[in-house]
């Protein structure tokens, strides 16, 4: 039995001892909290380590119950430590998330003396959230909105770390637990792993409950993406947004004083059991959870729009003007464009009624809308440093770098603006990789940078594919409309 398997068994035994169970009958002590409904399994092509069905499961069936005493919250942590409680009470200006971050670092500093040690041992030590991106990975996103979101996330993390500094000093945490890197880890842990609880806006860390991989809302065919360290709910906390979602996913239930998680659909024996924790675009998934989906029906692509267009869109929120992942325009965007491309003198009540109903104003106007949108998307694509084809090849080359059995040819490292070479140069690996003629093993730091760089390229490729799909959609619709116009003229 390998060390990883042994430590997992120890963790599941500890979880059973504190009342966590995948069985309705949790009164009987077992060596593991799992085995009745769930089992820890490996899903190499669907998120890595996750939870599989130990039997046939029905939609809405309880699959895991975690008592309140087992949840890791600010309340449960300070209840076990008077020194921590007294210090926290003197810092009311800190947010609940900052307090939980400090509490997490405080517990980590105790190491094996912490009550939570069996659980903390299994928390990943690295994350791929936007706030953890270095300058190279940030610039690799290419799109201004994504670069700005990364800078904003990093600045927010730095500001919160500085604000919490005095509390961490009062607790006499060792320098390594007070460092920005430690804070970045704690902040990422809480952002990506916490579950919603009604009594604390920071949420809670839920042992075993964070082993589930992610399923997009209302999409049971969606396959989880990325490595285990990047997309299971170990790194992506469950957020329950509606009562109906709670019934098929999970939530804290006062009547049983426990967090209860449910099967969101029927599962066969051995099939991976997934949970949904909200509706997010791919950029939001990267920002808050450190992964994205290859196919995400909730993704949105925003492009630069004229100021005069926004003034006409006052009836809709600014973030409703977007392109769906399949290339189609959102209701608000196409409605606004229809109005914007009509001369102001023709914007009478009948036109406005058509606009707000989401109806086509005229064939001529619709052709103008499709032509303008196609040209706009083409302009955005041309302004970006690399193309869809180039990014597709680059992703393949990054995969080669990640595989110790493969080696890039020199021509591959010099292609497409030398982005691969820039990565190797940044890690002092250019000469080693190209001249040695042998595969090399990257350091942990370089491997983490490589992983984040891959997410950046994958995200920008998805962005560009959506724009390309939008061009195809608009051109096809425009051609159909022109054909209709010609047929009407011939009548």
UniProtKB/Swiss-Prot annotation:
SUPFAM superfamilies: RuBisCo LSMT C-terminal, substrate-binding domain (SSF81822), SET domain (SSF82199). Residues 36-278 form the SET domain. GO terms for molecular function: methyltransferase activity. The keyword GTP-binding does not apply. InterPro entries: Rubisco_LSMT_subst-bd_sf, SET_dom, SET_dom_sf, SETD3_SETD6_MTase. Belongs to the class V-like SAM-binding methyltransferase superfamily. Its EC number is 2.1.1.-. It comes from Arabidopsis thaliana (Mouse-ear cress). This is Protein SET DOMAIN GROUP 40. One of its GO terms (biological process) is methylation. It holds the Pfam family SET. Keywords: Methyltransferase, S-adenosyl-L-methionine, Transferase. The lineage of its organism: Eukaryota, Viridiplantae, Streptophyta, Embryophyta, Tracheophyta.
